Each structure stands twice: as C-alpha cells, then as structure tokens.
C-alpha cells in the first residue's frame, strides 16, 4: 500500500509528534513536530525535516549545524498520531550539543544531568 502523509492523524495545529531514535543502538535522541509537508519531504529526501513551531518554518535537521539526521525507516503508531523515525545521526542531536535531548534524569526525587555535551 502506498503511503500518503494525509492518512496520518494530525493535531488541531496540523502537527504530529515525531520521536527520533538511533537505528543502530535504539537510543531515543529527540522529539520534535512535523506537519504533512515535513513528513513528505523527509520520505522524499531521506533527510529528516521537522516543523519549527517557534519559527513557523521547516527545519531540516543539521542544515546549519551539520548534525544531519538520515532517515532509515519511518514507523507509524497504531493510532496514526505519532511517528517513530529510525535515523542515522551525525554528531549531537540536541541543540545543547549533547547526543540526546533526554539528558536530564529524575533519580530519587532529584534532577540529574546524565549526558555531557559532546566535544
């Protein structure tokens, strides 16, 4: 069956959450938003494209930083309202220069930084 981004369930703002996961290690790297056009561009080019809610513009991951995300596989959840992007990550995924945006853990009621910025 051919894929049509319009078959996905978008929120009231026309967006769908997308979780980026390293295809080789399974590490969750980040979560961002996509609209139908960002999904289509990602599938078409193989370069992950998100929708920036703050800038109201497309955001090709790594276009300016060089920290590119290459799409290996796109998975759709059972309700078609969330995407899992299995990717190959070049450099850090987070704008804080960390491998993952999920670098703060709650341990024994305290927030702990568990990942240092990459050099």
Swiss-Prot record:
Described purpose of this protein according to its UniProt entry: Catalyzes the hydrolysis of the adenine ring of phosphoribosyl-AMP.
Main location as per UniProt: cytoplasm
Enzyme nomenclature, EC number: 3.5.4.19
Record keywords, A-Z: Amino-acid biosynthesis, Cytoplasm, Histidine biosynthesis, Hydrolase, Magnesium, Metal-binding, Zinc
Catalyzed chemical reaction(s): 1-(5-phospho-beta-D-ribosyl)-5'-AMP + H2O = 1-(5-phospho-beta-D-ribosyl)-5-[(5-phospho-beta-D-ribosylamino)methylideneamino]imidazole-4-carboxamide
UniProt-annotated binding residues for Mg(2+): 77, 79, 81
GO biological process, one term: L-histidine biosynthetic process
GO annotations of cellular component type: cytoplasm
Keyword DNA-binding attributed: no
Entry cofactors: Mg(2+); Zn(2+)
Residues that coordinate or bind Zn(2+): 78, 94, 101
Subunit (UniProt): Homodimer.
The family this protein is said to belong to: Belongs to the PRA-CH family.
Protein location: Cytoplasm
Bound cofactor: record note: Binds 1 Mg(2+) ion per subunit. Binds 1 zinc ion per subunit.
Molecular function GO labels: magnesium ion binding; phosphoribosyl-AMP cyclohydrolase activity; zinc ion binding
Presence of keyword Cytoplasm: yes
Gene3D superfamilies reported in the protein's UniProt record: Phosphoribosyl-AMP cyclohydrolase
Pfam family name, one: PRA-CH
UniProt pathway annotation: Amino-acid biosynthesis; L-histidine biosynthesis; L-histidine from 5-phospho-alpha-D-ribose 1-diphosphate: step 3/9
Protein known as: Phosphoribosyl-AMP cyclohydrolase
